[in-house]
Amino acid sequence: MNIFVEFFLVMLKVCWAIVMAGFKWLIRPKEKSVAGQVCVITGAGGGLGRLFAKEFARRRATLVLWDINSHSNEETAEMVRQIYREQDNPMSKEGAVGGVEEVPPFQPQVYTYVLDVGKRESVYSTAEKVRREVGEVDLLINNAGVVSGHHLLECPDELIERTMVVNCHAHFWTTKAFLPKMLEMNHGHIVTVASSLGLFSTAGVEDYCASKFGAIGFHESLSHEIQASEKDGIKMTLVCPYLVDTGMFRGCRIRKEIEPFLPPLRPEFCVKQAMRAILTDQPMICTPRIVYMVNFMKSILPFEAIVCMYRFLGADKCMYPFLAQRKEAMNNNEAKNGI
């Protein structure tokens, strides 16, 4: 085919893709069912991971919860079991038929596994255990994350490595563990819970930003690889929220006059937006929508212009109060241990 004709056809496809994206933004697509599907969630013991578990439980997925903390993981599992019990009660919800929701003929279950996702041997062995005890995995939610809370020159090398391993490298291990069967079946969904700090950065959290940039790069490259393999049954969703009020960045502050218009996100809102994206096979979701604009402006504006905007918003040193709190907390712990 003549290259000019092919270029013209490509431009038509690009325009059509833009039109369809706008159409989906205006008219909410129908959500797919995940009932009965096996869903692995890393970092399920609290924060967003726990909320993801509850949302998937309400949709009657079989949950496989991974966390390094056994007690927190079991707490999440009990919340999931309570949701299952409420759904099994025919009087708990009103439905369309006779005022009662019909209960599906299968009984979803929840399984818990304690492991460190930063240790690839542990990830691979636990994944094999999941396949034996639960079955093949349909959905993988790479959610586990940590933050060191130190300025670069004050951060121990071990904490930098830990941040990179958990926030980025673990995605490689979990994906390598579960993707082969997804490719074989041409069915599956991989979700990367990243951060807006993986799209644009700020001072004081170099290790965290690098880990999230890495996770996003991995996700995007993997998405292209799956597209190149023509496995259209495997979906990918990238979740990039603004700062979420889970306590991970407690103390982070932008300019006080701006903060009412851009407060930390409620975790419940963040997860509901992410669930909507996952269940409609949306490739990427940024919350709030202004994150899309900030990322676009970062791509086209000179660095000096970005610095001016950061200083106006108070985003250049927004992490400093958080870092100071973490340092004070560590000093207090060291003082207590020295008594």
Curated annotation (Swiss-Prot):
Major subcellular site: membrane
GO annotation, cellular component aspect: endoplasmic reticulum membrane; lipid droplet
Sites where the protein binds substrate: S195
Tree of life domain: Eukaryota
A Pfam family hit: adh_short
Membrane topology type: Single-pass membrane protein
Family the entry assigns: Belongs to the short-chain dehydrogenases/reductases (SDR) family.
PANTHER family in the record: PKSB (PTHR24322), RETINOL DEHYDROGENASE 10-A-RELATED (PTHR24322:SF745)
Protein name: Retinol dehydrogenase 10-A
Gene source species: Danio rerio (Zebrafish)
Gene designation per UniProt: rdh10a
